[in-house]
Amino acid sequence: MMTRREFLQTSAAMTAFAMASPGGASPLSPLGAEWFDRPMRWAQLNLSEDDVAKMDRAYWLDFFRRIHADALCLSAGGVVAFYPTKIKYQHRSKWLEGHEDFWTVMLEGCRKQDMVVLARTDPHATYDDVAEAHPDWISVGPDGKKRPHPDYPGMWLTCTLGPYNLDFMTEVTQEIVEMYDVDGIFANRWTGNGMCYCEHCRQDFRAAYSQDLPLERNPRNPVYRNYLKWEQARRFEIWEKWDGVIRKVRPNARYIANSGGGATSGLNMKKVGELAPTLFADRQCRERVMVPWANGKNGKEYRSTLGNKAIGGIFNVGIVSPYRWLNSTKSPAETRLWVQDGMANGLRPWFNMVSGQLHDKRGQKVIEDLYVWHYKNEKYFRNTSPVARIGIVYSQQTAEFYAGAADMHRLVEDPQLGFYQALIEARIPFEMVHELNLDAANLSRFKTLILPNIAALSDQQCQQLRDYVQKGGSLVATYETSLYDEQGNPRKDFALADLFGASFVSRANGKTALQNTYLYPEKSSPLYGSMLKGLEDADTIIGGTWQLNVKSHDEAGKQPLLRIPAVANLPMEKTFWTLDKTDAPEVFMNQIGAGRVVYFPWDIDRVYWEVMAYDHALLLLNAINWVNNEPHPLRVQGQGMFDATVWLQKDSMTVHLVNLTNPMAMRPQMHELIASPPQDVEVEIPKGKRVEKVHALMKTGAVQHTVNGSTLKFHVPSVLDYEVIAIDLV
């Protein structure tokens, strides 16, 4: 039997291919009045109220110079004004008295170093005097009671959908940009504190829909669906109002929202990508059980709608969550790999320091090391496009209208993570694709799309996928993909049944997961060799926990995996099998014109994420390789786990290898860096280009290589944490 590594290393001879830039993405903007693409290394000082008197300004300005930071985000207003505000009810820091204008000192110091400067605001909380004067500004729970701040007595959570944001914070925003020559306002925690039932929210929602606010978040409730639409519209109304106020005063300045993410994000990422001139992924560190590639995943998700706009990756050197050790320092190994995985996936580093007073200076060195190295190699991080032929689709409408908050992880995030993990282990480059970017222009660069239980799809989206397959694209889909419309309403059959080669009959489950299920590999199937590669000696394979009963459109015997009915798991004496197999296929493999489609009517992706079964990884990768039907643009052979990516720049391309081979990879912190075994790399050179030079950026020095046709081959003796191989092209 093949080992897993041997299987992953197996690939056919590579054919030449053209590398396209991301669909819908505009070229990188030139440097000039629009500053958005200029900064490569960000700093943020998330100030404490007493910092205006106690913070060492000279230290920080010198630190920014040493690390080549070219942008700063500095706390300005909202909860606390760090400048001499004249606005009633904006709480001025009591440490301002008797000191020079803190903001003027910091702004002038940064401008002397040619730094971009954003002013940070935070509208999520206010004080007793405001609550007494404007009780309608305070967030209200479904019980009708005003919400006190959970962490700080004497403060209150604000309603961020009403006049507090629309009027008061608009006034704060305008005052800041009138007083200071900033490049924009960065608003933190501006999207609220949960559903608000204040008089403004109740009146405004009723005016829009003639309904009362829903009391629970139930995606099946049409009133709650209306609330989601109303909330989205109000958020974007606030966004555009603040942006308009800023640009009226300073035409080159913009509003930058601290928002965004993947399928579980609360704001429509398509709209976010259209509005934002730049954005920052705020996933600052790992917590509990989180994979080290989660930072890079955030970068892919943001890029799916922002295209080539600059995206920063916010990180923290401390152990922030869940117990909020805000001024702490974690292991340098953990910080390095977290930031490096972001760099490898197109994120520009942004460190966030809570308080300008350093209570533990150990974190400064790792920031300096990362930033100085990044500065020295900056031209190889000014990317024009990623190189990937596979895209994982993520769906916010599936999360909101089908899964809801209670089932969001099981039905949405976990299936996606299963495919993501399998591709990481196989070192296959891929991108994320937003559900509203399924038009031909955006999909033209992909050979294969993965649909991990993308249950809620409109008729138009399904037609876009159908057109994509007819033009030679391929799909891998799972479980209830296309069984619901975009509003989460169930369909009688899959909208993509014609592509799946199967129709929905019923659910095999009740309300609980199945146990002790199995699959039978059907060796007589003509597709057995393609789906069971690496599993030739398997008599049975574990099955799913959530399964659908479906009816095949094809003759019996074609498909290579059949269902074995669930078997009792207790008492042990009753665990005998009643059937060795059934005629029910558990995978459907179809050739449709030049395209191919694989459909699994069960939760293979979700189960892989939870259980990490070796067999399921092979099935997922066999499905991807069969539909993709072309070698991957990057092949990396060797032991270990890497996040491997490829990028194009103006006159070069780069291969990024982030070494995730570590016993703490699935825990909150890595304690040490562990060098990888040797890796052999093959990468395809763009058509019309010739290799001039190949060199390593981390270990520094020329890399011996060979070129055979369009294929560049080289050997990497070892990777400690991160290696970037730069390939200069002519």
Label each residue range with its predicted role:
Residues W42, D70-L74, F102-P148, R254:
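Glycine-rich, aromatic-flanked loop segments that form ligand/cofactor-binding clefts
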Residues E49-I67, H91-Q113, E237, D414, ...:
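Aromatic- and glycine-enriched glycan-recognition loops and surfaces
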Residues I67-E100, D128-W137, C201, N268-T278:
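Aromatic-lined carbohydrate-binding/catalytic grooves of carbohydrate-active enzymes
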Residues R220, Y224-V730:
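Carbohydrate-binding surfaces of carbohydrate-active enzymes
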